[in-house]
């Protein structure tokens, strides 16, 4: 580049003369046709780029929802809240965590109270017993409530260090304990399937609410 600049400086290299601005105004040959094609292609490219961005955003949202298969703590709770709100039409924005239950909401005459857990082990008796403590505590504070209208839910992302198909099923001991307590275990993988069926129209919100309100033990999709 230095040598080329030197030759240019002493006038050995011939400079290409710049085209004047007015030359682009002269339309000849197939100029107009080609400019029209370029404009159409640019519009198509912009539309494709917009569609790609839209699909990327949807994939990112799907990935966020699927995160309940491996997360725990606040991150898990936040996404589960979003799913519960969409599935059941509840509003958890005003829920205050008093270090008791993880969620509490009412739909018509039914009260749903529950725990959300992300753990590496399978469901344990202590998880179900802790849920029952919250259930009984709520009844103690609301003596006017019919116990049959209060539903205790244990939303579990158990064995979250494994892919769902590699996880051991919830054992009968824990399922029977949940049945005895009148509570319901909902695995996060099942919660995602419910959301998928709701969005596809296979299940309505009313069907989902009734299924959750009237099931005991371990929630299974019909």
Segments from the language model and where they lie:
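Interdomain/boundary linker segments immediately adjacent to catalytic/signaling cores
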Residues: 15-69
């Amino acid at each position: 580049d230095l040598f080329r600049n030197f030759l240019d400086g002493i006038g050995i290299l011939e400079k290409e003369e710049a085209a004047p601005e007015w030359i682009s105004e002269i339309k000849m040959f197939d100029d107009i046709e080609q400019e029209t094609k370029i404009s159409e292609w640019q519009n198509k490219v912009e539309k494709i780029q917009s569609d790609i961005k839209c699909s990327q955003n949807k994939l990112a949202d799907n990935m966020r929802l699927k995160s309940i298969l491996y997360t725990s703590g606040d991150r898990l709770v936040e996404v589960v809240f979003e799913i519960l709100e969409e599935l059941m039409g509840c509003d958890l924005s005003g829920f205050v965590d008093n270090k008791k239950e993880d969620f509490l909401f009412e739909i018509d005459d039914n009260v749903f109270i529950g725990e959300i857990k992300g753990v590496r082990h399978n469901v344990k008796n202590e998880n179900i017993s802790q849920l029952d403590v919250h259930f009984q505590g709520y009844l103690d504070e609301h003596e006017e409530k019919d116990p049959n209208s209060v539903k205790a839910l244990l939303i579990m992302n158990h064995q979250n260090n494994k892919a769902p198909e590699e996880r051991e099923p919830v054992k009968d001991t824990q399922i029977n304990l949940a049945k005895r307590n009148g509570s319901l275990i909902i695995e996060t993988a099942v919660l995602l399937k419910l959301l998928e069926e709701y969005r596809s129209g296979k299940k309505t919100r009313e069907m989902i609410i009734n299924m959750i309100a009237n099931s005991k033990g371990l929630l299974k999709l019909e």
